[in-house]
Amino acid sequence: MACRWSTKESPRWRSALLLLFLAGVYGNGALAEHSENVHISGVSTACGETPEQIRAPSGIITSPGWPSEYPAKINCSWFIRANPGEIITISFQDFDIQGSRRCNLDWLTIETYKNIESYRACGSTIPPPYISSQDHIWIRFHSDDNISRKGFRLAYFSGKSEEPNCACDQFRCGNGKCIPEAWKCNNMDECGDSSDEEICAKEANPPTAAAFQPCAYNQFQCLSRFTKVYTCLPESLKCDGNIDCLDLGDEIDCDVPTCGQWLKYFYGTFNSPNYPDFYPPGSNCTWLIDTGDHRKVILRFTDFKLDGTGYGDYVKIYDGLEENPHKLLRVLTAFDSHAPLTVVSSSGQIRVHFCADKVNAARGFNATYQVDGFCLPWEIPCGGNWGCYTEQQRCDGYWHCPNGRDETNCTMCQKEEFPCSRNGVCYPRSDRCNYQNHCPNGSDEKNCFFCQPGNFHCKNNRCVFESWVCDSQDDCGDGSDEENCPVIVPTRVITAAVIGSLICGLLLVIALGCTCKLYSLRMFERRSFETQLSRVEAELLRREAPPSYGQLIAQGLIPPVEDFPVCSPNQASVLENLRLAVRSQLGFTSVRLPMAGRSSNIWNRIFNFARSRHSGSLALVSADGDEVVPSQSTSREPERNHTHRSLFSVESDDTDTENERRDMAGASGGVAAPLPQKVPPTTAVEATVGACASSSTQSTRGGHADNGRDVTSVEPPSVSPARHQLTSALSRMTQGLRWVRFTLGRSSSLSQNQSPLRQLDNGVSGREDDDDVEMLIPISDGSSDFDVNDCSRPLLDLASDQGQGLRQPYNATNPGVRPSNRDGPCERCGIVHTAQIPDTCLEVTLKNETSDDEALLLC
């Protein structure tokens, strides 16, 4: 307390000056002696996009416009950074923010980590003190577009959590922490252990306004900001620019003094109200400078100190007499508190506007103006248009003239040398502004209007090496050496890009190589597999191809099938011609019988063959010119007697002529057209013909009567009936044995060749459906008794009883009904069928014919 009240012994004007300094720290009058370490925050940068950076160890932060209402829709932020190892303590002194349930309308937050809230407050209750755990904090304030209140005012203090000793204006807490003395006994725990409020418990309750007697007529009641008790102060302390009351009641609602003037000279001076004393809060002044000359006006602020509390005080300078925002030259605030400040207009007119809020005050400013090329009466010209300097600026080690005239011919230096300061150290002109300090205080590198060759002139009148320009590093301090730099890719970037591209190319080549290798391996495996299959196919192709359909028909291995699948119409016509040629040569007619049985045993075949042999169904040849003995026929058709002419001679086929083939009977539909000679089929029919020829006792060979030549034949000797029956039985047994041998031989050949065409000979097909087999049956011209020694008779005569017995279908309901002969017009449709009989006609005549085994034997 001694440190604080010792200044009260000074005269009154010194006390007022001290109180003005104390206004910078609310609630901490002891810090007035260290005002350069006290921060008073305004809104010049706090309510922008970036937070206001604060490095002072203590200070005051208020909401915009405090103690008036804060504006709507505003966002302000402050970032306080203390020294490493220190903590920050915040004490709220006034707080009035629009309240809500979760403080989501208007709010104040304190964050130890960015964007991570640790403290949020709103409403009208003063929040408790906040003690940080780190050496930095973020303070954010937000208001919506609705109701506005008075706002907040807080004081912060940074220091270590435990100090061995505290200053005389500080209080040592029980935990070793130091806080300002003003925070003691304020009903708030700034120490963290409540030790700053323990002694106050023994004192009486804080006095209230009713406990005091009314003040005199020339006094006013005030809660002293120093003693924290109510007292009476003289009226002269009101609106004097000094804060005496804790609630600022002595400096609120004061009348604003009038200031400003119209300046019309080539040069002049002006200053803030009460300069060098504090200007009154709420000052609003405007100076209009009109030199009447077209030349530029140079405006210099030789001293400048503004208050930054609340919205902050400011000075705006316009190019011209009008307050045109587009012609605003510069705005000076409390952050520009340094001298000298120079502003140059583009014409002979300037408008200067000074505005101060109603909270606190400062020393203000002092300014001079002059037309370019003129000097003030008390100044010395630098020469030319280089400006002016005063006698106090002569030989002070600082170049006020760009040409250094104020620092030449100094007594302590030789000619063409300049002093570093008033201590006698000098340096030559060649060492001026070459980015190398020759003076201990570095004055040879300050206020450089020109730089030595090889150096770059910065906008802040500094010089750096030209090689440092556009090197992505701020060497000037204001970033002017990195402005308007061309985009040049550094060498290391190019090197990295080349190396990276080479590596990528190598990886791409490796990937392509691996892909090609895998592809070649896959194709090799594929070729190996395909080569094996090709060899197998080649082996199959080297085998002998199966006989064609025509060859099989010519060899008699298969009968001609009309519905055999073909590949083209030409092939169908060739097969049809071949079938007609064979039928024409053999004198057969086609009969289609259903074939169903596939697996008859050999003994049934022998029996059927013997039965067919008895009925004469295998007799395909007869002697030429023989008379056929008539026989009784059981057929429904009338008996037909005609001379049966042989297609094949017993001796040779050479005796046959084309005329005999043209005149022969047996082919339905008339005489067949001349066709190429076909090889007679080598079948069981030839075997039968050979057997008949060998067993015949005919010694004389018959000849064909052709071209008027008579052919003589020897009549066979008469045979008794008993011998005829015995011979017939022996002949049938012989033919049966030969048929067994022929069947066994064909079965062995079928086991070696299982082609679909060979399966037709064995009665086996690849399908399970019933197939139709066309059977060639010779047509007999007459009927006679069967003679085993007579090879001229056909073995099968459809007109005879034996033939009718073979053709008689099986009918369970009417066994006596037999279909009519195949020769002649069909009884159902009236058309002569030359080849294939339609199914509609077969439904009547062949519905219940013999079994498939018998039909196969007929083939």
Curated annotation (Swiss-Prot):
Residues covered by region (Disordered): 623-678, 693-723, 748-770, 801-823
This protein's record includes keyword Signal: yes
Residues of the signal peptide: 1-32
InterPro entries reported in the protein's UniProt record: CUB_dom, LDL_receptor-like_sf, LDLR_class-A_CS, LDrepeatLR_classA_rpt, Sperma_CUB_dom_sf
Top-level taxon of the source organism: Eukaryota
Primary localisation category: membrane
Ranges in the topological domain labelled Extracellular: 33-492
UniProt-annotated location(s): Membrane; Membrane, Coated pit
Similarity comment text for this entry: Belongs to the LDLR family.
Subunit structure: May interact with RACK1, ZFYVE9 and NMRK2.
Role noted for this protein: Probable receptor, which may be involved in the internalization of lipophilic molecules and/or signal transduction. May act as a tumor suppressor.
Protein name, entry field: Low-density lipoprotein receptor-related protein 12
This protein's encoding gene: LRP12
